[in-house]
Each structure stands twice: as structure tokens, then as C-alpha cells.
């Protein structure tokens, strides 16, 4: 008996893969011959929000999939974020997916849980399939507990597939894990400084884009957040600094000489 769709597209960040993701995969496979999974936020540096790289997430997806169906029914692609241009991001998704399409019946599946799910409406050429909430389970909650120092990873057993649990158990305590825990602790402590204020503070920062002889000036961050990552030179503006002036020119000149 033929299925309703030739393929169904499932977009997510999968940070990490959890039981609700698996439930959506199962539903998609009931409705289509093939499932195309789009991994978002590709090539992001490790952070509390994006702790796992594309290869790690693809591995989690494939290992969970093996419990559901055969590999030939699954295609996986990845796309980078385009923070300031949703349309450019949508084009990138379509360019990644289109070569994999067979037949005319394509669906896109997901759960519209909040305003962050707006992307599900950006592909009118694909039939939207609403997935009801399986359980009140969010990857952000999993990350919050998992990357808290001293957490017993056994709490994950009830919310992620066995293969994801095995991966997270191996990842736990490693250098990448400790880096993210340190980032989380820094951010949490930073926010605590202002928790009792009647209004949230507004900080103004500015970075410089310096081009010299066809090269763009970059620095390596020496402190958290983002310690060890590349960045444009800049930072907080002084209280009386002109916001249009941006970073101190002498600072940039010094960096160029070095």
C-alpha cells in the first residue's frame, strides 16, 4: 500500500536527540517512504545552546533511526544559521533538500510549540503535518540539567533513546563537556548579579570590522564567554563613549601593528 507522501522533511537542531524527536521520526515514516532530516545550526562553536557538532548529532540521529527502520529510508543534510535573514536560511534549506526529492508529494512535519516554530510556515510548497506534543519535553531542559556540574546522567534514561544516552554518558566529563559546563556557570553567575534589579540592565557593546590588505582582523577571546574562539575586536563601550565611535581606535591600531 502506497503512503501519503513520497518524503517528509523534518527540521531540527537535535541538541540532543530525545524521545520526542524519535516519536516524530516514527510518525513521518508512517506517512512517507523516506524521511529527510535537516540538521540546523551547523558549524556553530560549542556552547550551552549548541553543544554538539553536526557529526555528533548525525550519529545520534542514525543510531536512533536504526531502531525504527532501515538506513535507505533516511537522508540527512545540514544547514547553517542565517541570523539576520530568515529568507536566506529558507533558501539554504530548500537547496539542501531539493536534490533528494523524489515524486511530487512532500510534507514537512513538526510541532508548533511556540514562536520559535515559525519556520514551519516558511515552506508553503510542502504540506504541513502537525505533530501533537508527545510529552512536555524540551532539549533546552535536558541541556540545563546535563550541563550542571554534579548532575547524575541517569536522569536522561527516561527522556532520550538508549543510543543517545550512551553517547551522552561518554561525552560527560570529557574536555568538551567541561568547557560547556564552565561556560554555563559563567553565564549563570553573570545573570545572578542583576537578578534583584527592578529592570534588566542594557549593555552596549561594539565590535570593529578592520580590513587591511584584503585581510580581516580577528582576535582570540581570552576569557568567557566564548573563551578560545575567534572574534572581532571590541567589547563594552565606556559610559561616556560615543556609540557611533565604537571600539577605541588606538586599540585597533595596536592590534594591527602586532
Show the residue positions of the predicted features.
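A short, flexible beta-alpha/helix-coil linker loop
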Residues: 41-45, 224-225, 237-239
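N-terminal strand-loop-strand
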Residues: 192-232, 241, 245, 252
Amino acid at each position: 500500500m502506497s503512503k501519503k507522501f513520497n518524503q517528509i522533511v523534518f527540521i531540527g537542531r537535535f541538541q540532543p536527540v530525545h524521545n520526542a524527536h524519535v516519536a516524530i521520526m516514527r510518525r513521518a515514516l508512517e506517512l512517507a517512504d523516506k524521511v529527510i532530516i535537516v540538521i540546523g545550526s551547523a558549524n556553530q562553536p560549542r556552547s550551552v545552546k549548541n553543544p554538539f557538532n553536526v557529526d555528533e548529532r548525525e550519529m545520534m540521529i542514525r543510531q536512533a533511526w536504526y531502531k525504527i527502520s532501515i538506513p535507505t529510508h533516511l537522508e540527512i543534510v545540514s544547514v547553517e544559521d542565517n541570523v539576520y535573514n530568515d529568507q536566506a536560511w529558507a533558501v539554504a534549506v530548500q537547496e539542501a533538500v531539493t536534490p533528494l526529492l523524489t515524486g511530487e508529494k512532500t510534507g514537512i512535519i513538526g510541532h508548533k510549540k511556540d514562536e520559535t516554530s515559525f519556520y514551519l510556515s516558511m515552506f508553503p510548497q510542502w504540506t504541513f503535518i502537525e505533530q501533537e506534543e508527545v510529552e512536555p519535553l524540551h532539549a533546552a531542559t535536558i541541556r540545563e540539567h546535563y550541563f550542571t556540574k554534579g548532575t547524575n546522567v541517569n536522569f536522561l534514561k527516561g527522556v532520550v533513546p538508549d543510543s543517545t544516552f550512551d553517547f551522552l554518558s561518554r561525552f560527560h566529563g570529557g574536555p568538551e563537556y567541561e568547557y560547556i559546563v564552565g561556560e554555563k556557570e559563567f553565564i549563570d553567575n553573570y545573570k545572578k548579579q542583576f537578578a534583584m534589579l527592578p529592570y534588566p540592565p542594557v549593555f552596549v557593546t561594539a565590535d570593529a570590522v578592520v580590513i587591511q590588505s584584503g585581510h580581516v582582523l580577528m582576535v582570540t577571546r581570552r576569557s568567557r564567554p566564548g573563551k578560545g574562539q575567534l572574534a572581532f575586536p571590541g567589547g563594552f563601550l565606556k559610559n561616556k563613549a560615543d556609540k557611533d565611535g565604537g571600539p577605541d581606535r588606538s586599540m585597533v591600531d595596536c592590534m594591527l601593528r602586532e
